[in-house]
């Protein structure tokens, strides 16, 4: 039976239904316990990073190598024809798609990944982040980590803290968890960085419970997952950044009264929104979360590039 993700573009987490999300997570769990070092042997995957990245790029490229595929690409678009000669994104994608079996792409412009799919022919495009819009593979590793630590993706109490306006990770994760049952959201952010109205409207339309809060401590005892984010300096003007950067900081003392199963997650990089004393608590799970990116991205690439996959 052909898997439903074969040759499918993965641009938004909304491109995947609940059953497809669960397929990716099952595949990720299988690859974590039973590596498949030749699964994508002879495949070539382009890693096209038009925006700076450390974890996402290295995680993708490690995933590609561990599946036996080859990787080509760039991590600095200023040295490409697009950056130096003014080539359009459309032409860049049209050419790259003739070289490779799949394209992994990060771009600072919202909608760029969707645009790329119009010029990639039959070559699937995987969005590694487009501006403040979507970051679907981060969401897949977040879901994998939540399931790994909680044993479920239904009936989760999750708080999202910090930059909820520009943070594409929280946008995608909110949309993904809304596909499951009984989840409850606690949003903790300064007014200037509040969760976008369209996401709150989506939750309300689905009858999903959410609430807005001014402090972390007031909700900690109710939580299964505490999802911290940094204030994104690169997306704010200096005066706005100075006003909000230290408004919500998690310290170990703030976790007094937490349930035993609570895990603190963060898409990283961490700046100063989680103090290092949290690292020593049993609740910290952000480094393991980052490591899970290998398995989530391996799973997605394996499914996108294999018509039939049974692990």
From Swiss-Prot:
It comes from the Bacteria. It catalyses: carbamoyl phosphate + L-aspartate = N-carbamoyl-L-aspartate + phosphate + H(+). It is an enzyme of class 2 (transferase). GO terms for molecular function: amino acid binding; aspartate carbamoyltransferase activity. Its EC number is 2.1.3.2. GO terms for cellular component: cytosol. Pathway: Pyrimidine metabolism; UMP biosynthesis via de novo pathway; (S)-dihydroorotate from bicarbonate: step 2/3. L-aspartate binds at residues 85, 168, 230. Carbamoyl phosphate binds at residues 55-56, 106, 135, 138, 268-269. It holds the Pfam family OTCace_N. The keyword Transferase applies. The keyword Transferase applies. One of its GO terms (biological process) is 'de novo' UMP biosynthetic process. InterPro entries: Asp/Orn_carbamoyltranf_P-bd, Asp/Orn_carbamoylTrfase, Asp/Orn_carbamoylTrfase_sf, Asp_carbamoyltransf, Asp_carbamoyltransf_Asp/Orn-bd. Heterododecamer (2C3:3R2) of six catalytic PyrB chains organized as two trimers (C3), and six regulatory PyrI chains organized as three dimers (R2). Belongs to the aspartate/ornithine carbamoyltransferase superfamily. ATCase family. HAMAP family: Asp_carb_tr. This is Aspartate carbamoyltransferase catalytic subunit. It comes from Yersinia enterocolitica serotype O:8 / biotype 1B (strain NCTC 13174 / 8081).
């Amino acid at each position: 039976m052909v898997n439903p993700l074969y040759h499918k573009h993965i641009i938004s987490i909304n491109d995947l239904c609940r059953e497809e999300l669960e397929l990716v997570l099952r595949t990720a769990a299988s690859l974590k316990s039973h590596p498949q070092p030749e699964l994508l042997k002879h495949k070539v995957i382009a890693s096209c990073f038009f925006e700076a990245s450390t974890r996402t790029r290295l995680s993708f490229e490690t995933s590609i190598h561990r599946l036996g595929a080859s990787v080509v690409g760039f991590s600095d678009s200023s040295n490409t024809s697009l950056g130096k000669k003014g080539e359009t994104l459309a032409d860049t994608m049209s050419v790259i798609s003739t070289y490779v079996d799949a394209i992994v792409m990060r771009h600072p412009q919202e909608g760029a990944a969707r645009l790329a799919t119009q010029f990639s022919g039959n070559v699937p495009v995987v969005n590694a982040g487009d501006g403040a819009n979507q970051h679907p593979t981060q969401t897949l590793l977040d879901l994998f980590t939540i399931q790994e630590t909680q044993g479920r993706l239904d009936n989760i109490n999750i708080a999202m803290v910090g930059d909820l306006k520009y943070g594409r990770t929280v946008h995608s994760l909110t949309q993904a968890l809304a596909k499951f049952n009984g989840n409850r959201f606690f949003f903790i952010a300064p007014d200037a960085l509040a969760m976008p109205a369209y996401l709150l409207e989506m939750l309300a339309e689905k009858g999903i419970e959410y609430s807005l809060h001014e402090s972390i401590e007031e909700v900690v005892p109710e939580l299964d997952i505490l999802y911290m984010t940094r204030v994104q300096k690169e997306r704010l003007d200096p005066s706005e950044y100075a006003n909000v950067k230290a408004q919500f900081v998690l310290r170990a003392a703030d976790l007094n009264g937490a349930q035993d199963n609570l895990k603190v997650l963060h898409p990283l990089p961490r700046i100063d929104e989680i103090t290092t004393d949290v690292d020593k608590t049993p609740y910290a799970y952000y480094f393991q979360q980052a490591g899970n990116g290998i398995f989530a991205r391996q799973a997605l690439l394996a499914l996108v590039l294999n018509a039939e996959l049974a692990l």
